UniProtKB/Swiss-Prot annotation:
Record-linked InterPro entries: Cu_polyphenol_OxRdtase, Cu_polyphenol_OxRdtase_sf, Cytotoxic_necrot_fac-like_cat
Reactions performed catalytically: adenosine + phosphate = alpha-D-ribose 1-phosphate + adenine; S-methyl-5'-thioadenosine + phosphate = 5-(methylsulfanyl)-alpha-D-ribose 1-phosphate + adenine; inosine + phosphate = alpha-D-ribose 1-phosphate + hypoxanthine; adenosine + H2O + H(+) = inosine + NH4(+)
Swiss-Prot/TrEMBL cofactor(s): Cu(2+); Zn(2+)
Positions of Zn(2+) binding: 58, 93, 109
Domain of life of the source: Bacteria
Assembly information from the UniProt record: Homodimer.
Name of the protein described by the UniProt record: Purine nucleoside phosphorylase Cj1217c
Alphabetized UniProt keyword annotations: Copper, Hydrolase, Metal-binding, Oxidoreductase, Transferase, Zinc
Length: 226
């Protein structure tokens, strides 16, 4: 693991890629926009030239980043471009970062709906469609802070649906999104999985909608370096 401080957590940092989570302030104010500036230089990440924030819609929609994008309504972004930070806002939903050693990155907002609809598979399918000879052994999946099973109660129609379609990941009325995503990743041939192990509900350093009913969000980020 890279640097870990009171205002950010670095999961991978080398000469090719940076992956981190920033929780020093409410990043929800940057939603749904491409920012032509480095919003994370104060944390020591100096290489970033642009920061791309999705207009997250709780879907499994994934798009390929283009600097001319006008509509950022999606829950996943894919890019090969250097020094462009792909950003995921969350406060219990799972932020997923996918990195392929050939120089491809993706940032995914995998909440309950996105996980049920397997947004990770949608992302990998798009990547492999554009890059048919990729070695799947060189994919790396990072699961950043999100709600853990013991704090994720579901009920009503959602619980009934989960028990029917995802029974292995439901214990009484608790849903284990992290276990579901790991299972989906392994089915896609992704074996390099790093879970930061942080529950956003338990750790008060992180915003949690379930705990506090807040509209504030921390951000998970990935970018390729020159």
């Amino acid at each position: 693991m890279g640097r870990s401080r009171k205002n950010f957590l670095s999961l991978l940092e080398n000469d090719k890629v940076g992956i981190f989570c920033a929780f020093d302030k409410d990043y929800n104010v940057f939603r749904a926009k491409i920012h032509n500036e480095n919003l994370f230089s104060h944390l020591g990440f100096k290489d970033i030239e642009k920061c791309v924030f999705m207009d997250q819609i709780h879907s499994h929609k994934v798009i390929i980043y283009d600097e001319n994008l006008k509509n950022l309504s999606c829950d996943g972004l894919i890019s090969k471009e250097k020094n462009i930070a792909l950003c995921v806002l969350s406060a219990d939903c799972l932020p997923l970062i996918l990195y392929h050693e050939s120089g491809i990155i993706a940032a995914l907002h995998s909440g309950r709906k996105g996980s049920f609809e397997n947004i990770l598979k949608e992302c990998v399918d798009q990547i492999t469609m554009q890059n048919s000879h990729l070695d799947k052994n060189k994919f790396h999946l990072f699961i950043l802070p999100g709600i853990c099973a013991k704090n994720y109660e579901i009920d009503g129609e959602i619980l009934e649906f989960a028990k029917k379609e995802f029974k292995e990941f439901v214990q009484d009325d608790k849903l284990d999104l992290k276990a579901l995503v790991k299972f989906q990743a392994q089915n896609l041939g992704i074996e390099n999985i790093k879970d930061c192990g942080i529950c956003s509900f338990d750790d008060e350093s992180f915003f949690s909608y379930r705990r506090d009913k807040t509209t504030k969000r921390f951000v998970s980020v990935v970018y390729l370096k020159d």
